[in-house]
Amino acid sequence: METATLVAISISGLLVSFTGYALYTAFGQPSEQLRDPFEEHGD
């Protein structure tokens, strides 16, 4: 394969991996440990 194709596939894979990890952190098991500043600050 060409170098440009491998670079494009690598960057795309990293982007998909980062997005998946971000979604897992936001909505998965670790999300229970996140604090909600809006709930802490009652008006």
Curated annotation (Swiss-Prot):
InterPro entries: PSII_PsbN (IPR003398). Keywords: Chloroplast, Membrane, Plastid, Thylakoid, Transmembrane, Transmembrane helix. GO terms for biological process: photosynthesis. Its main location: plastid. It is found in: Plastid, Chloroplast thylakoid membrane. One of its GO terms (cellular component) is chloroplast thylakoid membrane. It holds the Pfam family PsbN. The chain crosses the membrane at residues 5-27. It is a single-pass membrane protein. May play a role in photosystem I and II biogenesis. Belongs to the PsbN family. HAMAP family: PSII_PsbN (MF_00293). This is Protein PsbN. The gene is psbN.
